[in-house]
């Protein structure tokens, strides 16, 4: 039996083909009625709080690691101190896993303007919802990093405020490429983990969806921390840059917006028009109307 064939057993032991799967309708580009819905504002608040918590935990982890490995502060034990790059990657991936699990049923658990942008391009969310989500995510990120500075004021500026910047020895093109590829991996994983066709077939998939998303964030951090400090989330990069507010994070800040947005757009196109055969369906519809 092909994997696209679904067979059910009848009461008399016979078999018959199940109904064909139907994709949900695309979200409207502009849904004015949505502005009067409490569910929209509840989702926006959830995105704000989730992004605030994400930035607070992760940036605090980065600052703590740099302090623990600072030879001038920790002495001879500095080389063996701290959680290491592996621990930082786990902090980012683990928090995404937790927060997506907590907020998926309310807002979809985006916590990232690049994810929201990719889902908007795929017509999964309306323009109104996408814009409000992105604003909430950016404000939440700024507030989250602000809390880190308030609680760790002695170390925040000294250790770079957890801000993203291009590492020495790497060109802007390399940094941009790292952000594009890293965000592609993340957004592609989001599309695959939340694919309604897969969810319709396997009832356990919605419960497990946060796991591959968090793991994708973890793996991307391992690969790109040495290059850009790993952005793949424009709100994360903006929040740290605004609160730290030094020249270095702002010099190449455009990389942490252009890279993730391009990566998200490529992932949306790949999933919708290649894997889900959107281009073939559109071509077939065009031919049938010709």
UniProtKB/Swiss-Prot annotation:
Induction of expression: Expressed in roots with a circadian rhythm showing an increase at the end of the night period, a peak during the first part of the light period and then a decrease.
Pfam families: MIP (PF00230)
Membrane topology category: Multi-pass membrane protein
Motif NPA 1 mapped to chain: 112-114
Localisation: Cell membrane
Tissue: Expressed in roots.
Keyword field contains Transmembrane: yes
GO biological process entries: protein heterotetramerization; protein homotetramerization
Record region (Disordered): 1-20
Domain notes: Aquaporins contain two tandem repeats each containing three membrane-spanning domains and a pore-forming loop with the signature motif Asn-Pro-Ala (NPA).
Record text on subunit structure and interactions: Homomers. Can interact with PIP1-2 to form heteromers.
Protein name per its UniProtKB record: Aquaporin PIP2-1
Biological source species: Zea mays (Maize)
Source species taxonomy: Eukaryota, Viridiplantae, Streptophyta, Embryophyta, Tracheophyta
Gene: PIP2-1
